[in-house]
From Swiss-Prot:
Species for this entry: Brassica oleracea
Gene symbol of the encoding locus: CSN6B
Family: Belongs to the peptidase M67A family. CSN6 subfamily.
Location in the cell: Cytoplasm; Nucleus
Gene Ontology CC: COP9 signalosome; cytoplasm
Keyword terms of this UniProt record: Cytoplasm, Developmental protein, Nucleus, Phytochrome signaling pathway, Signalosome
Protein name, UniProt field: COP9 signalosome complex subunit 6b
Length: 58
């Protein structure tokens, strides 16, 4: 089971990722107006979400 502070951090990442993406991940990655730094940040947040969801399945 994850520590409550870790859960808060994950929840924060989830909220930010959903607010930042606001579109499908494919749109974000293909949108030429989104710069490399933004894509990198979004990818890191998506990675955190993926790890979180994976841990919830165990």
């Amino acid at each position: 089971k994850l520590h409550p502070l870790v859960m808060l951090n994950i929840s924060d990442h989830l909220t930010k990722a959903l607010m930042d993406i606001n579109e499908s991940p494919v749109y974000v990655l293909l949108n030429p107006t989104i710069n490399h730094a933004q894509k990198k940040m979004l990818n890191s947040r998506i990675r955190v979400l993926h790890q979180y969801l994976g841990s919830m399945q165990k």
